[in-house]
Amino acid sequence: MDFNVKDFGALGDGASDDTAAIQAAIDAAHAAGGGTVYLPAGEYRVSGGEEPSDGALTIKSNVYIVGAGMGETVIKMVDGWTQNVTGMVRSAYGEETSNFGMSDLTLDGNRDNLSAKVDGWFNGYIPGQDGADRDVTLERVEIREMSGYGFDPHEQTINLTIRDSVAHDNGLDGFVADYQVGGVFENNVSYNNDRHGFNIVTSTNDFVLSNNVAYGNGGAGLVVQRGSYDLPHPYDILIDGGAYYDNALEGVQLKMTHDVTLQNAEIYGNGLYGVRVYGAQDVQLLDNQIHDNSQNGAYAEVLLQSYDDTAGVSGNFYVTTGTWLEGNVISGSANSTFGIQERADGTDYSSLYANTIDGVQNGTVRLYGANSTVSEQPSSGQQATLEGTAGNDVLSGTGAHELILGLAGNDRLDGGAGDDTLDGGAGRDTLTGGAGADTFRFSAREDSHRTDSASFTDLITDFDASQDRIDLSALGFTGLGNGYDGTLAVTTGSGGTRTYLKSYEVDAQGRRFEIALDGNFVGQFNDGNLLFDAAPVTGTEGNDNLSGTDAGETLLGYGGNDTLNGGAGNDILVGGAGRDTLTGGAGADVFRFEALSDSQRNYTAGDNQGDYIIDFAVGEDRIDVSALGYTGLGNGRNGTLAVVLNSAGDRTYVKSYDTDANGYNFELSLAGNYQGLLGAEQFVFATPPEQATIEGTDGNDSLQGTGADELLLGLGGRDSLNGGAGDDVLDGGAERDTLTGGTGADTFLFSARTDSYRTDSASFTDLITDFDPAQDRIDLSGLGFSGFGNGYDGTLLLQVNAAGTRTYLKSLEADADGQRFEIALDGDFSGQLDSGNVIFEAGVFNAKDFGALGDGASDDRPAIQAAIDAAYAAGGGTVYLPAGEYRVSPTGDPGDGCLMLKDGVYLVGAGMGETVIKLIDGSDQKITGMVRSAYGEETSNFGMSDLTLDGNRDNTSGKVDGWFNGYIPGQDGADRNVTLERVEIREMSGYGFDPHEQTINLTIRDSVAHDNGLDGFVADYLVDSVFENNVAYNNDRHGFNVVTSTYDFTLSNNVAYGNGGAGLVIQRGAEDLAQPTDILIDGGAYYDNALEGVLLKMTNNITLQNAEIYGNGYSGVRLYGTEDVQILNNQIHDNAQNVAYAEVLLQSFNDVGVSGNFYATTGTWIEGNVISGSANSTYGIEERNDGTDYSSLYANTIDGVQTGAVRLNGAHSIVSDQPGTGQQATLEGTTGNDTLGGSDAHETLLGLDGDDRLDGGAGNDILDGGVGRDTLTGGAGADTFRFSAREDSYRTASTSFTDLITDFDPAQDRIDLSALGFTGLGDGYDGTLLVTTGSGGSRTYLKSLEADAEGRRFEIALDGDFVGLLDASNLIFERPAIEGDAGDNALLGTSVAETLLGHAGNDTLDGAGGDDILVGGAGSDSLTGGAGADVFRFDALSDSQRNYDTGDNQGDRITDFAVGEDKLDVSALGFTGLGDGYNGTLVLVLNSAGDRTYVKSYENGADGYRFEFSLDGNYQGLLGNEDFIFATPSGQQLLEGTAGNDSLQGTAADEVIHGGSGRDTLAGGAGADVFRFSELTDSYRTDSASYADLITDFDASEDRIDLSGLGFSGLGNGYGGTLALQVNSAGTRTYLKSYEANAAGERFELSLDGDLSGLDESHLVFDERVVLAGGDGNDTLSGGSAAEELLGGAGNDSLSGGAGNDILDGGAGRDTLSGGSGSDIFRFGDALDSFRNYNSGANVTDSIADFTHGADLIDLSALGYTGLGDGYNGTLAIVLNDAGTKTYLKDRGGDAEGNRFEIALEGNHADQLDASDFIFATAAAATGIEVVGSTPAEEQPVV
């Protein structure tokens, strides 16, 4: 319908004020349900409203303003207007407006003739509130001469389009997009505006700017930027085509935004940059023409720059990363510095491909980011960099060439196809290059290292020496060697299956670089695959321009005036001769000078050949002058360099004043002021001339060392020696000397005992002031001491003084002169001195020399121990036991064992069986190790070989272990470097070999353990250790037992047979300790053991390969609560000898009772195994249905099993006859923002929470983004995009969490919506999805228009236009059905949600993964849901029935019901709940064995059958109604009467019966019924008549009477708000009555049949008010007939009390309150619950729809108001609007922010309201009431 404004009085004469007339036309169109308001050609003058937010004209829903054309119809502000106008035409503030707009006219702000700020167009909802304007269209609109903004759609608008419009000569921006969602600016022009042409701000997203033009603006042509620091940045914005030129600042500026694409635009002639990316992420600049910018100064055409807001409002630093520039044609102006430039401010990860750049002045490209790249070739895909987090990441590349950065954490990186660069970063990483020529880059030595106690070594799994490379160029190693002096050693593990590249030199933290490679690469490393130093970039003798890359390189300029730029990486720049300009770029660079002529100056001749360093970074870069002989900074003389600042303060010179024969002196300069910043640490100086020996005299000398390695000899006298830097040797000589080593590894040498001694009367003890036990040594090798001891017998006693400030090494044996050797050390070194830092003499100690006999009878323990102690005292050695049997006894304490080995001592015999150490007969003590290391001491470099330990178990009674070593469990320390070879341990009652807790680098090889009472071999917390070529047999428990945090452990070619437990077990040691991890089991055999061949229990990252496992009692291999286990290329056969088991069993472990955890077995990889079953073997490979999942089975050969080759229950487990294409079949994200990339295999990618990016790569993949706003790319192959919950992808009125599918192929890809309940395509309502596109047709949306309780509407987006292409072939709405027939069927589901229909027959249904529905149908069926939330549905009684008379049992059996997840659907059968099995209920019955629960009815059908099914397990006390889907009980739940005299009869169900007014007869029937009375007039009497209701069957045992809405307080005498209980004389009727009447003479009375004199307050509900509470959103709460309390909470709520005396409290937000019938209270608990701010325009005033004077109350007691008045001093004013339709209660004072309390009452209450209608803070009544006919003028808000 059209509404011509001239019909409403508008003149359009350019003089008259037409505001009212045009607004009247708008209002009329709105009242008619919508229409077009037409303005014929003319000039229509308009004025503003009372407030800025009123604008001039307010447009409303479904109304469009249309003119005769731009310039023909003009709406113009009146002259002289002085008040701000936030939108000449606008939508109403605080109201959601939709389907409106404007076209074919001009808005003129008349800025020259008024003084106020006036904006042109404005629309939008309240910032931060839940709401939005929608579907707004502006076409062919001109906005000009505004003093403010032109087009200003503002905050929370969805689907706005502005096209073919113009903004010019406005005071601020031409076009603004402020929080626009799904909008379009198309074919618009913005010119000559004072600020920006286009300004996109404040969370705007999913927004398109197409073919717009901006020129001649005072700011930038187009800006996309953050609006406020606490709001999300704009994102997902496409700028396509158009032109941005001749603007004063940038053509396009992208500032603090992300995911923006700028393409196909022309950008030229702008004052600053053509394009500036400023603190933005993931921006694409594609195929643009950018030229002739930088008109106002020297700038790059394209600048990439980070934004430092740390001192600003947010406190954040916004790094520009992930910028992609491709296919742009860039040409510079005379001022343009670079074509593309990164600032050196953290900007990084820029990717430049195939850009054409010319005409720039300084260089085409300048990149500083260490990970930024440039190529002249087109890219192979956008994702050039995959970056992890600080956590443990799994990153997988695609078929492209990628850079994969793990960063911190223990990461798994897989390059996939392509020539990739993998950089694990910090943490213990696993690196797999995949196909292609890959580079494994190490950027810092600490990225891959080990210490003495832990390994953080990276593992390369698939190094190809013929094409892959290891880049070590950033680490400073010089090549391969012995691991010292900057070289790397190449070693292999004992089995030759792993190669190590390692340095033996530690840093200050004890870290030594090491990497590991799977496989043997000895002899295969060369310059082609190990990059120690990047190939040099060399110049010529001419003037060269050399540029590095992002690697560490050496740039050699040679002769000429060269320009060298290192780029990223740690570079070395050598300018050579000539005057060179040196720029290091990013990284730690070295500027090296190899000759004086490299940088020199002749002040006499005026010849300046000094080099110039542009960007020297203090603390990172260095200047190397070591080749020139300069030794330090100084005055520039005598081999020193002076630092001199020029007079301008902008250049620093480093120079020598010493000239050569030609008059030249060395000099270089640095750009900038480095005074006070340069120190010796910024230089590499020459080592001062070496002084090999600094010798003193016989006097008291003070000797000072230098930075070299020196020998300081004090000779006689009391000397003071200080070694300085370097590894020095200090020998004080005679007398009392003070020795200070200084930095470096120093040796304190004592050449004679008399060099340092004391007597009884005097001390001549030398003092060492700074001994470092980690690197320094004390050399006593020439003094004859044998080691540590008690100070006697050639030993030294270690003693610390009482204060703990000084340590002494002393002999207590004096020489002939009474002198006892002694030295002192400053500090407490107890426990820190050992053979590693105190040098004694070592040798071989024969036990027989110490009294051992070896005769098989004598106790040789003391003699052997004496030999051990002597070897230790001598600094280490070998204790040799010749052939014989050496009996030993225990020492008494179990922890002392029999023999105690010590540092540096090895126990060696004549051979196994030749030398036997045997426990004496009759020993009854517990012995924790016949041979062991000391408890609580760190012992290193010790072991045992070529002998037998015999525990003599038949002739002893204590628990005896053979070998034991280790440190205190849980403490910081470890035994180290332990070796046992050719040792037999037998006949122990306990363990054989038991290396225990915290041992590093232990090797046991070629040894045997047999006939022991527990395990043969134990590995308990071993690190970097090996068991090799050992045999364990006939032990009572396990052959090998690996426990307690053991990691980096190898078991190679071991054999275990005939043991009473398993052959090999790897398992957790205790619930509070880390699990064993990173263990390789390679080769060997495990057979004929009583339990499993190999058991892996509560462990992770284990590989079992190349072994033969057979003849064992249980499974060959059992995985029990493990993660990431590989079982590869084994022979597993003929196991399950003792019981029916699978050959390979995968099972989860329920440890809730101990640790509280459930350990699911996941990530198992089984490939290439040959498996053959025995007569008992059930399956070749079986998963238990207990949460075990993500198993991947490839190319295994299985035969001879009895039940089936494979049984998998995991929803994500897979099996294939083909070899696997990679280990990772499932990629799973975290709760953060993840980037997951698939490979060429078929994979499932699970994003989980967070805003994830999933890329399937090749293969037929399943992508499930999970919660968050995800970007899904299927890649090659037929991919499925799965949505598991509606909240995985949705939008609300104000925010979008919509997932985006970037590459949907309707011919092969599918979208799986089967779990969401949608029925198909449609209009978006009634369970259908609507297909729409964005305005440009470049994006398709699948959306529901129906919101859930939280306001969420399901929606997904697809890049591209798929209208007409989406159908049943690519959209999965319904779960697929798997159907049987009338026979006995076995139906197996898959990992998706399905319906399994068995139909008739005795069927077996297994849902496997997914949320399945299982319907067995007729017959006795077995139902297994599998993983997921499954529903077991029964459609007929005959689906599961039993006849107890005939014995026919057709009951179904459910094997795996999961309480809290699965459901039992009996709704079709009419059962209404759990009960006694009668009257439509079901009863739960447990069988006598307690292992099966029956769900049954006791009511037989006509054929004698009753419904019954069973569940495996005991569910008594676990199953409740919530686990069932029951039928709705028959009959109404609420029986509601009318106003007449009703007769209401209940049923057997529980009902609420409300007769309402009238004299009603009420009967509840069976069940627990409630008789409700909401108002006094529901049941009452007067003096002359009775209208009392009668309850005929009140059951005091279960019924109740609800009086909560009437205000009675309890039973009493009928007065004071109580009710009297009275029985008539015949005892046939009981009355509840009040004797207090209301004004109409009505008093409550109720009759009940029978004598109910026993009624008490337990049968009556007096004040049990139900609370209905909303949330923080916009809630609608509706009460019933009872008295309720309705709490809205935050948000704009709608509260309706219904019947009853209700309390309504809207809370914060603009609420609508309706009490309904009854006496209601409208309560306000905070002044901001209902307020208005006339300054800001905020209107949050609550409205009461049905206030009733004399019945309802308004409760203001919490706010402090004392009465009615003028609105000041604690009173409220009553104000009536002009129309007399609304009454306001107002506080005219307000708070400090200008917020004024205000309530609106619908209707005219001005003459009725008085103090009796309120609950004030005090009882003060108002003395006067001010009634104002119209609203007074308020202060005007500033918008």
Swiss-Prot record:
Cofactor: Ca(2+)
Span list, region Disordered: 372-392, 1215-1238
Subcellular location: Secreted
Pathway(s) per entry: Glycan biosynthesis; alginate biosynthesis
GO BP: alginic acid biosynthetic process
Enzyme Commission number, as recorded: 5.1.3.37
GO molecular function, one term: calcium ion binding
One Pfam entry name: Peptidase_M10_C
Regulation acting on activity, per entry: Inhibited by zinc.
Extent of the PbH1 repeats: 133-155, 157-179, 180-202, 204-226, 257-279, 280-302, 320-342, 347-369, 975-997, 999-1021, 1022-1044, 1046-1068, 1099-1121, 1122-1143, 1161-1183, 1188-1210
Hemolysin-type calcium-binding repeat feature ranges: 387-399, 406-422, 424-440, 538-550, 557-573, 574-591, 695-709, 714-730, 732-748, 1229-1243, 1247-1263, 1265-1281, 1398-1414, 1415-1432, 1536-1552, 1554-1571, 1670-1681, 1688-1704, 1706-1722
Reactions accelerated catalytically: [(1->4)-beta-D-mannuronosyl](n) = [alginate](n)
Keywords, sorted A to Z: Alginate biosynthesis, Calcium, Isomerase, Repeat, Secreted
GO CC aspect terms: extracellular space
PROSITE patterns associated with the record: HEMOLYSIN_CALCIUM
InterPro entries: Beta_helix, Carb-bd_sugar_hydrolysis-dom, Hemolysin-typ_Ca-bd_CS, Hemolysn_Ca-bd, PbH1, Pectin_lyas_fold, Pectin_lyase_fold/virulence, Peptidase_M10B_C
Keyword Repeat recorded: yes
Bias-annotated ranges (Polar residues): 372-386, 1215-1236
Cited PANTHER family: S-LAYER PROTEIN
Family: Belongs to the D-mannuronate C5-epimerase family.
Comment, domains: Composed of two catalytically active A modules and four R modules. The N-terminal A domain introduces a mixture of MG-blocks and G-blocks, whereas the C-terminal A domain only generates MG-blocks.
Additional remarks: Each enzyme of this family of C5 epimerases introduces its own characteristic sequence distribution of G-blocks in their substrates, explaining the extensive sequence variability of alginates. These alginates of varying composition have different physical properties and are necessary at different stages of the bacterium life cycle.
Role summary: Converts beta-D-mannuronic acid (M) to alpha-L-guluronic acid (G), producing a polymer with gel-forming capacity, required for the formation of the cyst coat.
Protein name: Mannuronan C5-epimerase AlgE3
Organism of origin: Azotobacter vinelandii
Gene that this polypeptide is encoded by: algE3
